[in-house]
Amino acid sequence: MSSQVRVAVTQAEPVWLDLDATVKKTCDLIVEAAANGAQLVAFPECWIPGYPAWIWTRPVDMRLSSTYIQNSLKIDSPQMASIQKCAAENKIVVVLGFSENLHNSLYISQAIIGSDGKILTTRKKIKPTHMERTIFGDSFGDCLQSVVDTSAGRVGALSCWEHIQPLLKYHTYAQREQIHVAAWPPLFPHNEDGSLFSMSSEGTSSIARTYAIESQSFVLHTTTVIGQSGVDRMATHGGALMSTPGGGCSAIFGPDGRQLSQPIPSTEEGIIYADLDLDQIYHSKAFVDVCGHYSRPDLLWLGVEGSVKRHVRENAATVAAEAEQQEQ
């Protein structure tokens, strides 16, 4: 495989709370990215059907919550199949952020779809952030395996403030990704109204740079744009976050933290491209490898519980006793 990889990072606005229309727009963006030579295209957090921005204005909105459930994406669905088909037809890796509907419970999810259209992995955000917990559930243990081999290199993904979870980050670093997709909702410049700098466009850019430096990977920082249509659709006027048009700040960072892309204005939609040389990772690895030569696992190590705890499961002792009785 060549060390040269062309990537595309979207900065776009979904068709808010409309599953089918946003799936169509997803495919349009995939086609556009592939036509411009990209081998991988990245989409933001909850790109389908759009991030539920109203949660930062009011914690309960039964009408919108019901609509959101009905328009969230099921993995085994015609809509997902159409995205897979589009990826295969255009021979491009797709890293998709979406609200996953699993038996009408929702999860902040990501899928990595290979250039042959096969889903290589799906994962759920391990813990929804703050008000997101009014909509979304926690992940399962198998979601820790978030890095896979693709035709564009070894690719991994996390969502939003998962990028400030030290243990989760280290576990992801240990899976040896070359390209990392950092998926975010709309992000806005910091102001002095008491909001957290770490939730601003500047703060999250710093988080992306840090991730690149710590992991020695290329980071594709992808964000959503919210226009007036989104503000009106979700009635976020006067809310704490996402109450005005904007939010776009997509970027691409190299494995030493330098920015490799030029920004698109925050209210504008577009795709950012960069030609990556994966061999540049060696330059950073020569100095630091936090899961290799620059580590001390004899002193500090990470424990992981990666099994899936089902909602309904048999007690092991009971199963063994029943089996013994049947043998008698």
From Swiss-Prot:
Which Gene3D superfamilies does this UniProt record tie to the protein? Carbon-nitrogen hydrolase
Which controlled-vocabulary keywords does the entry list? Hydrolase
- Residue ranges of the CN hydrolase domain? 5-278
Q: Which reaction does it catalyse?
A: a nitrile + 2 H2O = a carboxylate + NH4(+); 4-chlorophenylacetonitrile + 2 H2O = 4-chlorophenylacetate + NH4(+)
Concerning PANTHER family, the annotation shows: ARYLACETONITRILASE, NITRILASE
The role this protein plays is: Nitrilase that hydrolyzes preferentially phenylacetonitrile and (R,S)-mandelonitrile. Also acts on dinitriles like phenylenediacetonitriles (PDAs) 1,2-PDA, 1,3-PDA, and 1,4-PDA, and cyanophenyl acetonitriles (CPAs) 2-CPA and 4-CPA.
Record's protein name:
Arylacetonitrilase
Organism per entry: Aspergillus kawachii (strain NBRC 4308)
